[in-house]
């Protein structure tokens, strides 16, 4: 089964639909299977005190201006939906509150996503599980008890899901990846397991692919120097193309695990073993 590669646009569009479409183009041209966004209802997710606090940004001088500037509304998501259908690439989004999930459900995307930060928000998990769409569940900032409960909710709802091993640091240091958790999750929950990476570079993602992940999510950016907290942990277009190309090569290289003589080895074997006239 081919690894399902998700290009996480998140909020790296900076509230600009043109940037969003440029990033969708990059994902499609690179061979990704889907793009993902993030959706928040600002007055639910953040406190009034935080929203009123000072923060310089391209949209104003407080946190509210910055948070609202990064959010897309109905018209933008309608255009994203239309554009992705035109290009033939799936899209979906991770909701950070119930209202946002209900908003997203009107677009009837094929997939849902539980962000690591939301894994312990049971009402949201129950709402998403009730939709019975294939759901990617990131496990960053979570312990076994947290993940057990999330899995229980999805199993009770009979909603298809896969876990995504994740370390929620931005960017993540390679030595923090703990990729052996991929096998731990697979063995404990008897489900498909993917990897959601926030590292700089590609080596950790390649290693995850070799460990048998079924999905891979990486943030993408037009330019890592652009404004935004997620840009530094993102892949620019050239790196994304390199990632997807290498992942597809790794998939082919893994093989089926059967120990046999490759047909291409036979003439070489005859030549190199001719002096003792034996070919296995």
Question: Could you say what each language-model-derived stretch is?
Answer:
Residues 1-280:
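Catalytic cores and adjacent flexible loops of soluble metabolic enzymes
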